Amino acid sequence: MQSYASAMLSVFNSDDYSPAVQENIPALRRSSSFLCTESCNSKYQCETGENSKGNVQDRVKRPMNAFIVWSRDQRRKMALENPRMRNSEISKQLGYQWKMLTEAEKWPFFQEAQKLQAMHREKYPNYKYRPRRKAKMLPKNCSLLPADPASVLCSEVQLDNRLYRDDCTKATHSRMEHQLGHLPPINAASSPQQRDRYSHWTKL
């Protein structure tokens, strides 16, 4: 709260900001504080499918294949023997070991997988495999939490401040060119005061 109050105080007491910017500060705070949050929330829900009907109902799991049947006990055994090994590393090791097995060694697990698939078809005759889409990672500059009103306000005011300064600079140069265009030409007969005045305007 202290940072937000100090930011507001500095904005209202500064002479660099135009009256239009100061009048629009409450609107900026209301419209910008949750702008990124709302867009990210809607994008996150669309990408992960949180509101889809498929997630409300329990999804039917796929029947296990031969590799899954074989790896159930092997994964449990490897995890107990290597408690610090990551799950991804265990999967790599199991995949390598499965490839090293002969067809005769794999055959019992293929038979078990066929039995499980037959039981699955009887239990779920209308089952169709629908792979899930992986949820995309949210941008780093976007948060699901409400944005800090002070930071959003300061960023908006800084942008308007830059535009305001550019307008003031253009107006100043325009006035200087207009005044220089009305100055009398400098010649040898001009007085020292006229030459000093012309030199002063050209140096601005």
Curated annotation (Swiss-Prot):
Region described as Sufficient for interaction with KPNB1: 59-136
CDD domains linked to this entry: HMG-box_SoxA_SRY
Any one GO CC term of the record: nucleus
Biased composition (Basic and acidic residues): 194-204
Chain intervals for the UniProt region annotation (Disordered): 175-204
Protein keywords: Acetylation, Activator, ADP-ribosylation, Calmodulin-binding, Chromosomal rearrangement, Cytoplasm, Differentiation, Disease variant, DNA-binding, Nucleus, Repressor, Sexual differentiation, Transcription, Transcription regulation
Gene3D superfamilies: High mobility group box domain (1.10.30.10)
DNA-binding region extent: 60-128
Location of the region described as Required for nuclear localization in the Swiss-Prot/TrEMBL record: 61-77, 130-136
Region (Necessary for interaction with SLC9A3R2), start-end ranges: 198-204
Domain notes: DNA binding and bending properties of the HMG domains of human and mouse SRY differ form each other. Human SRY shows more extensive minor groove contacts with DNA and a lower specificity of sequence recognition than mouse SRY.
Assembly: Interacts with CALM, EP300, HDAC3, KPNB1, ZNF208 isoform KRAB-O, PARP1, SLC9A3R2 and WT1. The interaction with EP300 modulates its DNA-binding activity. The interaction with KPNB1 is sensitive to dissociation by Ran in the GTP-bound form. Interaction with PARP1 impaired its DNA-binding activity.
Family label: Belongs to the SRY family.
Name used for this protein in its record: Sex-determining region Y protein
Organism: Homo sapiens (Human)
Gene: SRY
